[in-house]
Amino acid sequence: MPEAYSSETEKHLSASGRRLFKKCPWAYQMRYVEGISPIANISLPLVFGGLIHEALEGWYVPGRERGVPPWETFKDGFQKAAVDPENAGIFVDEQDYQVNLDLGLDMLRGYVEHYGEEPHLEVIQPELEFQVPLKYKTLDGEDRRSIMGFLDLVYRDHSNSGTLHIMEHKTAKSLSNSNQFLPLDEQASVYLVVATQTLRDRGLIGSKEVVHNMVYNYLQKTMSDTRPRNPQGLVCNKPKKEHYIATLLAAGVEMEAPEKISVKDLTKLAEDAKLTVFGDPSAVQPAPRFARKLVARNTKEMKNQVLRLRQDLMMIDATERELLPTIKNPTRDCGFCEFSQLCILDEQGSLDLDGELVRRSYTRRS
C-alpha cells in the first residue's frame, strides 16, 4: 500500500511529503505513490539526529523540572545503535564511532550548560503526534486527507506570560544566515495550524487558547572550544608574563621586582592565591553552537496557510490521479536525490519499476 494512503479510504500527507512534492513531483510519485525507497536508507547523520531528538525528549519531560540528562540518554542509545544489525556499516571504523559518540556527548553537555534547566519552561508534551483531517477541492469534486506528523515539544514560557510554543529540534553542521527563510517556512506554518486543534482535542490547552509561536532549536554539530574564557565569556590565548603580573598585583599579592620573576614562579604564585590568569582575548572567537529562532504566525497568516495547503492538496490529488502530468524539476540537487538513478533511466526511456535495478537497490511497498 503506498505510504500516501493510511487505509483504503483515508489518505494522509506529512510536511516532508508536501515539501518533496513542491520540490519535485516525480520524486514524490516514486516515494509516496509507487512506494519506493532505497534499501540502504540508514545513514550516520540520520541515526545521530534521531538520537539527539530522543535525548532531548527525555530531558524535556512534562512539567517544569527536567528529566534524564540528555548526554546519558544519547550515550545509551548510541551504544545500542552501534550494534544494531540494521545500522551495519554506518561507522568507518572504531575511531569514527568514538569521534561521533564524543561529539554527541559534548554537544548535549554544552546545550545544558548554555541553556540551563530552564524552569520557566513548562513542558506540556514532548513528541506529540498529530493527525488532523482537512477537506479540499479536487478538479472534479471534493476529498479529504489527514495532515500527519510529530511536534518535538509543546510548552508554556512562563518568562513570557505563559505563552504557548512549539519547539522543533534541528542539528546542523553550521549556524548561518541560511535560516533567513524561516519567516516563510511552511513546516512552521503547517505545525502551527494543526497544533491548536490537536492540543484542544486532547485537553492539553484551553478551548480558547491558540498556539502562535514555533521555535527552531538549533544545535551545531561541533565540539566545544576548550580554550579558557574570561569573565566576559571571551576565549583567551595563553597568558603571558605581563598577564600574570597584572592579575597578581590587582589581587593585592605583594611581589618585589615582579618583572624579574620567572613565568613558572608567577604561575605558582597565582595557583597559591587561587587566581585564574587569562591572556588576551583571541582574535578569532568561536561561533555560537546553539541558537533558537522564533517563527510566529498570526491568525490571518494561519488562515492563508490553510488556503495554500488546500491548493497544494488539489495539485497533489490531480497528479496522483494522473489528471495532471507528473513533472520533474532538474536542479543541482538532483545528484543528492535518492531516485537519481531511476530518473536517469526514466529519461532514457528504460525505467522498469519491476526490473532488476529496483529489486536490487530499492524496496517497494505492495
Which residues fall in each region the model found?
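RecB-family 4Fe-4S metal-dependent nuclease core
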Residues: 1-366
